[in-house]
From Swiss-Prot:
Residues 128-150, 268-286 have a biased composition (Basic and acidic residues). Residues 543-671 form the CheW-like domain. This is Chemotaxis protein CheA. Residues 125-155, 267-286 are annotated as: Disordered. InterPro entries: Bact_Chemotaxis_CheA, CheA-like_dim, CheA-like_homodim_sf, CheA-like_P2_sf, CheA_P2-bd, CheW-like_dom_sf, CheW-lke_dom, CheY-binding_CheA. GO terms for cellular component: cytoplasm. It comes from the Bacteria.
Length: 671
């Protein structure tokens, strides 16, 4: 039966791990925030329960270890530090590897010793803990084999409900001592309520009075609690005797005892605030539950099948339109127009179903940036914007690695160490921005840093050294042409190779991935100001609007999303400047390429009048010269397969309404 729920378990576990990572990153910025500590604790507690239910004992055990560490932080026994979070993050990474192993092999055995890790982090937490400032003395009592009790004498003020505060204060006025006791049972303890009853029995023997328990006595009797119970006690005996008595009870992992020397009643305002907060949280939960209830999980394969069928419908519609043009059957015009509208609406709905927020990609990066910056001894303020920007799920699967490389480059090459930034008059903390937005029919993703920028002179020297250009050619290059050398395979300006970057691989791979998605990439950089890398992707790779053009009676398709403008030109409009053909549009010089020359196909004598399709690739423009324009159409992109994967000029093919094939021009691959 469990196999049926494995997919749901994996999906939900990944979501919890992502939320846990985000919470821990926030906790590092606000280590005293008890709400964040509680949130992380609850996430691990839920993960532990899910893993236990599915029978993944190693994962459940590891979650329990991390849960206990955060529980100590909740009880102010230890403080959250960056070093402690390093250990917790390492544990979260182990859980992630377990999930990957569960997906691939159905087992959570990752070949790593969980006990060793658990002992290490427990030891670190104990040795590195900082005692709260208000605690004066602390004594420990140990059983014969292991530590069970901790007793704390402190001047601690506890905020309690009015009735409890009144009782404890009255008891102190009469000379009694008042204590806060936390009993933690061992994991897997049977008959938990019976063990807590033994605690009550011991307290009764010592003539102690239990004023309040958390959870309630009824919940304890029904075992509606995990492994912890909190008590407020009035006692005639001192802390040491209490600790000695309670530590002797079997199956108790630990007892924490604090003497309460002052109590404070909740004010009316506090009560109202708490009530309001609870109401708000209840409303938030109800709203979240409402949203969840309106969503369903759909297998990706089913979405792909739906998209394929949608594509076939678009092709069928185009063929019907083509047939009607030949026979001019007016009676069918209205029906066909209605069919076209329905097809278009259906197409838009299917496209939206495939869209997912880019946060699915972005959310993995804050943790990576934090770890890498710390490893390289740099301080980085990482800002993400536009995480709710939606794009086709195909891009989500493909764009992650290129963005990862760009972020690593920014931290390694771009952002300077603290001392260097101060010497330059910059803020000591570097800024790294990852943003996404919709721009027309494109998704624009930018990676921007305020680091040292790219040394263009260094790029030119390296290009000359590699024999890519000579010195005379170098003098004529624009800034953009210089920066484009970074996309040449094996090109790197970094002298010293690090394990992060500088191995001469990466940017060419980034460019190849982006262009395989019919996208474009460009770089802007200013020395000592920073660098910005911009990626432009079409909204979808499935069905696109394209301009059909003709060259030598062959039909090609150019994606509308890449087209800036279209104009008719004559042979005389094309000028030769610095060994390249250009045209001038409203004072702007734009390079042009004859499509037949780019594709190396035979062409009849150049026509007096031709069409120039001006396309935009990143922040560059150029013109594609063709014989004629055939109009705009919705086309379904079909892959050319592995055999033609090296042909950069084409990004795919499409079946037209008359059954013929049109190759789709990859505007990034022409230049």
């Amino acid at each position: 039966m469990m196999e049926e729920y494995l997919g749901v378990f994996v999906d939900e576990t990944k979501e919890y791990l992502q939320n846990l990572n985000d919470t821990l990153l926030e906790l590092e910025k606000n280590p005293e925030d008890m709400e964040l500590i509680n949130e992380a604790f609850r996430a691990l507690h839920t993960l532990k329960g899910m893993a236990g239910t599915m029978g993944f004992s190693s994962m459940a055990k590891l979650c329990h270890t991390l849960e206990n560490i955060l529980d100590k932080a909740r009880n102010s026994e230890i403080k959250i530090t960056s070093d402690l979070l390093d250990k917790i993050f390492a544990g979260v990474d182990m859980i992630t590897r377990m999930v990957d192993k569960i997906v691939s092999e159905g087992s959570d055995d990752i070949g790593e010793n969980i006990d060793v890790f658990s002992d290490t982090i427990k030891s670190f937490a104990s040795s590195g803990k900082e005692k709260p400032s208000e605690i004066k003395n602390e004594t420990e009592t140990k059983g014969e084999e292991e530590h069970k009790g901790e007793s704390t004498s402190n001047e601690e003020v506890v905020v309690l409900p009015e009735e409890v505060a009144h009782v404890l204060q009255e008891a102190r006025n009469k000379g009694f001592k008042t204590f806060y006791i936390k009993v933690i049972l061992k994991e897997g303890t049977q008959l938990k309520s019976a063990r807590i009853y033994l605690v009550f029995h011991k307290l009764e023997e010592l003539k102690c009075e239990v004023v309040r328990t958390i959870p309630s006595v009824e919940e304890i009797e029904e075992e509606k609690f995990e492994n912890e119970v909190e008590l407020f006690v009035i006692s005639p005996v001192d802390l040491e005797k209490l600790s000695e008595a309670l530590s002797s009870i079997a199956d108790i992992e630990r007892v924490i005892i604090k003497e309460v020397t002052a109590v404070t009643e909740e004010s009316g305002a506090e009560k109202r605030t708490e009530k309001e907060e609870k109401t708000e949280k209840t409303e938030e939960k109800a709203e979240r539950k409402k949203v969840i209830s309106q969503t369903v999980r759909v297998d990706i394969e089913k979405l792909d099948n739906l998209m394929d069928l949608m594509g076939e419908l678009v092709i069928a519609r185009s063929r019907i339109l083509e047939t009607l043009k030949k026979y001019n059957i007016k009676e069918l015009d209205e029906s066909l127009s209605h069919l076209s509208r329905i097809t278009l609406d259906l197409q838009n709905v299917v496209m939206k179903i495939r869209m997912v927020p880019i946060s699915f990609v972005f959310n993995r990066f804050p943790r990576m940036v934090r770890d890498l910056a710390k490893k390289m001894n740099k301080e980085v303020n990482f800002i993400m914007r536009g995480e709710d920007t939606e794009l086709d799920r195909t891009f989500v699967e493909e764009i992650g690695e290129p963005l990862l490389h760009l972020l690593r480059n920014a931290i390694d090459h771009g952002i300077e160490p603290k001392e260097e930034r101060i010497a330059k008059g910059k803020p000591p903390i570097g800024t790294l921005i990852l943003s996404a937005r919709h721009e027309g029919n494109n998704v624009v993703i930018e990676v921007e840093d305020d680091g040292r920028g790219i040394d263009k002179e260094k790029i030119i020297r390296k290009a000359i050294e590699k024999g890519l250009i000579d010195e005379s050619k170098a003098a004529t290059l624009s800034d953009q042409e210089i920066l484009n050398f970074l996309f040449v395979p094996g090109f790197s300006t970094k002298e010293k190779v690090s394990e992060v970057s500088g191995r001469g691989v990466g940017m060419d791979v980034v460019k190849n991935v982006v262009e395989s998605l019919n996208g474009s990439i460009s770089i802007e950089s200013e020395k000592d100001k920073g660098t910005k890398v911009t990626i432009r992707l079409p909204l979808t790779l499935a069905i696109i609007q394209a301009l059909l053009v003709k060259v030598n009676n062959l039909v090609y398709a150019i994606p509308i999303a890449n087209i800036d403008t279209i104009l008719s030109i004559s042979k005389e409009d094309i000028q030769r400047v610095q060994d390249r053909d250009v045209i001038v549009i409203r004072g702007e010089v734009i390079p042009v390429y004859r499509l037949w020359e780019v594709l190396q196909i035979e062409h009849k004598e150049e026509l007096e009048e031709m069409e120039a399709v001006i396309v935009r690739v990143g922040n560059r423009k150029y013109g594609i010269v063709v014989d004629d324009l055939l109009g705009q159409d919705d086309i379904v992109i079909k892959s050319l397969g592995k055999v033609f994967s090296e042909v950069k000029e084409f990004s795919g093919a499409a079946i037209l309404g008359d059954g013929s094939i049109a190759l789709i021009i990859n505007v990034s691959g022409i230049v």
